[in-house]
Amino acid sequence: MNEVLAKGKRAKEVARELVLKSTHQKNEALAAVANQLIHETAYILEENKRDIEEGKAKGFSDSLLDRLMLTENRIIDMTEGIKQLIELRDPVGECVREWERPNGLSIQEMRVPLGVVGMIYEARPNVTVDAATICLKTGNTVILRGSSSAIHSNKAIVAVIHRALKQTSLPEESVQLIEDTTRDSAKQLFTMNDYLDVLIPRGGKQLIDTVVREASVPVLETGAGNCHIFIDETADKQMAIDIIINAKTQRPSVCNAIETIVLHEKWAQQHGSELFSSLKERGVELRGDQRALALDSSIVLASEEDWGTEFLSLTLAVKVVSSIEEAIHHINTYGSMHSEAIISENEENVSKFFVSVDAAALYHNASTRFTDGSEFGFGAEIGISTQKLHVRGPMGLPALTSTKYVIRGNGQIRK
C-alpha cells in the first residue's frame, strides 16, 4: 500500500478514536502543540531555511519567498493563534435545534465532526499549523498535502506536532502529512472517497480549479478573490476614496483585496481624477475601459482578460458604467463570488445590489478587506468558501462539522 492510501486508511481509523475525545482533552493537546512549537522554534527555522535556499536557487519571486519564510515572530504569532483557538467554543456536541413530535419522540440535531479532512495547499507553511489545529479543535483527523516548495518546513512542523501529541491523550496520527509532493500523490488524494470526507484546497486559481475539476471527493472550494467595489452616483467622495485605497493597497496579495473598481459615470466625471491620483501616488497601475481613458490618459487600456484576473498586486482594473444595472451585470459576469461592495447613499440601489449580486459577502460603505474569520468574529478560519453547498464565506469552526439527528423515545413504533 502506498503512502497516500496508507495514511488515508489510518486517518479513518483514528477519526473513530478522536470523536470520543472531550473538549478539555482537545484543548490540552492544542496547548501542548503551542508549547512544542515554541520549544522547537530553532529546528523549524533551520528546516525552513532549507526551503528558502532551494527557492532562491530556483528563482522564486520575492513575494513567494516571503510566503514561504518563517521567523521567530511568525511562529510566535502561530502559537498566539492556537491560544485563541483554545478559547473558542467547541461546536462539536452542540444541539442546533430540538423539538418533540406529537407521538412523544424527542428529536435533536447535533453537531459532529466531518471525519477526515484533506487539505491541499501551496507555499505557506503557516497553513500546516492552522489546518492541523483547527481540525484537532473540531475533532477531525487531517491529511495535509503541501507543496514541494515548503516540504522541509512542513515535515518539521508535523514532526513537532507529533511530539506534542505524544504527550497527550490524542493520537499523533490525528495529523498526517503526505511527504510525496509529486502530482501523482495529489491526484490520488482527489479520488480517495473511501477515506476522505472532504478535500479543501487553499492556493491560487490554478490549484483550486484543478481540484474542483478532477476531484471525486467532496470539495470545499476556497475560491479566488476577483473582488469589485461599485461607486454609485451618490457615493460620498472621501469615503469612497478611503475605502478604495484600503481595499486595494493595504494588502494587495490577499483574496479579499479588490481587483476592479466600477464607477458610475456621473461620479467618475466629478471625482475620478482625484481617486486615480490617490491610487497612482500609492504605486497602483490602472487598467481601464475607453470611458476611463477619456478621464485619465495615463490609464492603460484594459484587455478582456483583465476583467477576470485576480492580480494579487498593485494593479487595478477600472470600469465606468452608466447605471447600477450595468455595474451589477459586469460584477456578476466577471466576479468570483467572493466579496463585492457598493458605496452609495441611495438605499434603493443598495437593496438592489444586495439582492442581485451573487457573492459570499456583500458590503455597503465598507472595505472588502473584512471578509475574514477573525473580522467576522468567528476566530479561527480554514478558508473562505465561494460555493453555495455546505458553507459559504469565512469558514469558522462550525464549517468543519456536520450534523446528525438523535431521536429519543419510550417504545414508539410507526403505525
Swiss-Prot record:
Any Gene Ontology biological process: L-proline biosynthetic process
Record carries keyword Cell wall biogenesis/degradation: no
GO cellular component, one term: cytoplasm
Species of provenance: Bacillus cereus (strain ATCC 10987 / NRS 248)
Cellular compartments annotated: Cytoplasm
InterPro entries cross-referenced by the UniProt entry: Ald_DH/histidinol_DH, Ald_DH_C, Ald_DH_N, Aldehyde_DH_dom, G-glutamylP_reductase_CS, Glu-5-SA_DH, GPR_dom
Protein name as it appears in the record: Gamma-glutamyl phosphate reductase
Function: Catalyzes the NADPH-dependent reduction of L-glutamate 5-phosphate into L-glutamate 5-semialdehyde and phosphate. The product spontaneously undergoes cyclization to form 1-pyrroline-5-carboxylate.
Keywords per UniProt: Amino-acid biosynthesis, Cytoplasm, NADP, Oxidoreductase, Proline biosynthesis
Catalytic activity, as annotated: L-glutamate 5-semialdehyde + phosphate + NADP(+) = L-glutamyl 5-phosphate + NADPH + H(+)
Family: Belongs to the gamma-glutamyl phosphate reductase family.
Enzyme class: oxidoreductase
Chief place of localization: cytoplasm
Pathway: Amino-acid biosynthesis; L-proline biosynthesis; L-glutamate 5-semialdehyde from L-glutamate: step 2/2
Sample GO molecular function, one term: glutamate-5-semialdehyde dehydrogenase activity
EC number(s) reported in the record: 1.2.1.41
This protein's record includes keyword Membrane: no
Xref: CDD domains: ALDH_F18-19_ProA-GPR
One protein family per Pfam: Aldedh
